[in-house]
């Protein structure tokens, strides 16, 4: 019997912190996390939004597209622009996942969708759920 590949979730937005405090090692770890999420959850669409103090670029991936990240940035840090980008582009994500070191104090108002902060630091975000990842 032929197999049918289904999508599991709706649209996911992934904010990637590309500020100056994020190095190549962290970006590689973030890329691995995004690829694992795409393989496991099979969302309908993934928007990867690169942000330092402003949104620098974004990429959109479909459910079966290979994930190849092209990060842009290197300045200061502000988390608000990713959330503003979601609203400005009329995207209704099932969740927003932010990959960051949490070295920032500029948080947006709490959105209506769930937010997961994925970090390699011991800091905690003021809303949503904070998950710590460690290097393998």
Predicted segments — roles?
Residues 1-3, 34-37, 83-86, 104-105:
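Generic recognition of flexible, low-complexity loop/linker segments
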Residues 1-13, 25:
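Acidic, polar low-complexity linker/tail segments
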Residues 11, 45-47, 95, 114:
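Residues at the starts of beta-strands that form the adenosine-phosphate
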Residues 18-28, 32-67:
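Redox- and metal-dependent alpha/beta enzyme cores, enriched for Fe-S-associated oxidoreductases
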Residues 23, 106-109:
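Extracytoplasmic/secreted cell-surface and envelope-processing proteins
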Residues 47, 51-106, 119-121, 132-136:
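Von Willebrand factor
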Residues 111-113, 126:
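Short, structured coil segments at secondary-structure junctions
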């Amino acid at each position: 019997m032929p197999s049918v590949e289904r999508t599991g979730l709706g649209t996911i937005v992934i904010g990637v912190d590309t500020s100056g405090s994020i190095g190549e090692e962290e970006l590689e770890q973030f890329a691995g996390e995004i690829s694992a999420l795409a393989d496991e959850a099979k969302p309908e669409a993934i928007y990867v939004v690169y942000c330092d103090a402003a949104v620098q670029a974004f990429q959109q991936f479909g459910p079966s597209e290979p994930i190849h990240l092209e990060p842009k940035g290197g300045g200061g840090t502000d988390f608000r622009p990713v959330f503003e980008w979601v609203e400005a582009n009329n995207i209704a994500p099932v969740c927003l996942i932010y990959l960051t070191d949490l070295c920032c104090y500029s948080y947006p108002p709490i959105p209506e969708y769930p937010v997961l902060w994925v970090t390699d630091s011991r800091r905690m975000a003021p809303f949503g759920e904070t998950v710590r990842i460690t290097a393998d």
